[in-house]
């Protein structure tokens, strides 16, 4: 494996312990057991000094730490970014309320915003956020922008699709470094990609084996 990436942006296909959550995820993409995700040799993709930015859900805090460590990273913060999930039509309804004068003060606006956050499952409170941890290998990466904020408000896209804004903020945070998105679904300028739903993969990533696709095809 010749390609080494300084920034690895990952959205693992977590498997859930209950039938409802696991079934909902599996309806849209293939989930994987933790042990199988750990066996993917992400450590072969990572540069000596690199950053892992990885999504996880509130039910998988410990699993996320274990996975980062299995890939050779040390978790620095569990809340690099927090995505506040808005309903898909939140923009239309909020704009309508503002236009029609339904919002008369700051607290009206807060009530409206809270009403438009997604209501997911939960055994205690109902979940409406998802977090991205940041972990480092070696010395990590130098922060290029000191004004990048943690919280991202963004409507839901397709099932489990993450906001483009987070990828953009990572670019601002760490600069123009070699970067790859794993378990990717769509391409983005300046990024390499790997995943069974992306059109073109930069690498072939199998348990115990990472292969540069371009090098393989040229051989």
Residue locations for each model-derived region?
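Class I S-adenosyl-L-methionine-dependent methyltransferase catalytic core
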Residues: 1-219
